[in-house]
Amino acid sequence: MLVGIGTDIVQIPRIEKILHLYPQLFAKKILTLKELKQFALLDKTNRATFVAKHFAAKEAVSKAFGVGIGQGINFKDITILNDDLGKPIAEVSSNYTKKYSFLNIHLSLSDDYPVCVAFAVVEGGYNVIPV
């Protein structure tokens, strides 16, 4: 069953400015521990695009759940990783997903300076709550 779709677009220069002012603070606000480990390995020229893509991906996934960031799901509830072939994978905190019997999250990311875009489709089944 389709839970929802979501999309987001981010201006990479906007993220560059924020990272210049708050290099670690902003990254720590947006990224999970797994993502921060990847972020730390990047050279400074790739960090803004990395954060912009993760920001857009998390916004798109949250919108696909029908809530948006800050409306029941937060940046730290969603982790964006890549499989061995580079395909983006979204992991969502079990605190948020426990109402679903299963979830499939499909995520597509693209960037072409000065923008990056994310598109997410969430499929799932709801747990039936006995009355």
Curated annotation (Swiss-Prot):
InterPro entries the record matches: 4-PPantetheinyl_Trfase_dom, 4-PPantetheinyl_Trfase_dom_sf, ACPS, Ppantetheine-prot_Trfase_dom
Entry keyword Cell membrane: no
Catalysed conversion reaction: apo-[ACP] + CoA = holo-[ACP] + adenosine 3',5'-bisphosphate + H(+)
EC number: 2.7.8.7
Family annotation (Pfam families): ACPS
Gene Ontology CC terms, in alphabetical order: cytoplasm
Co-factor(s): Mg(2+)
Keywords: Cytoplasm, Fatty acid biosynthesis, Fatty acid metabolism, Lipid biosynthesis, Lipid metabolism, Magnesium, Metal-binding, Transferase
Binding site for Mg(2+): 8, 59
Compartments where found: Cytoplasm
Biological process (GO), any one: fatty acid biosynthetic process
GO MF annotation terms: holo-[acyl-carrier-protein] synthase activity; magnesium ion binding
Family: Belongs to the P-Pant transferase superfamily. AcpS family.
Role summary: Transfers the 4'-phosphopantetheine moiety from coenzyme A to a Ser of acyl-carrier-protein.
Descriptive protein name: Holo-[acyl-carrier-protein] synthase
Organism field: Rickettsia canadensis (strain McKiel)
Gene this protein is translated from: acpS
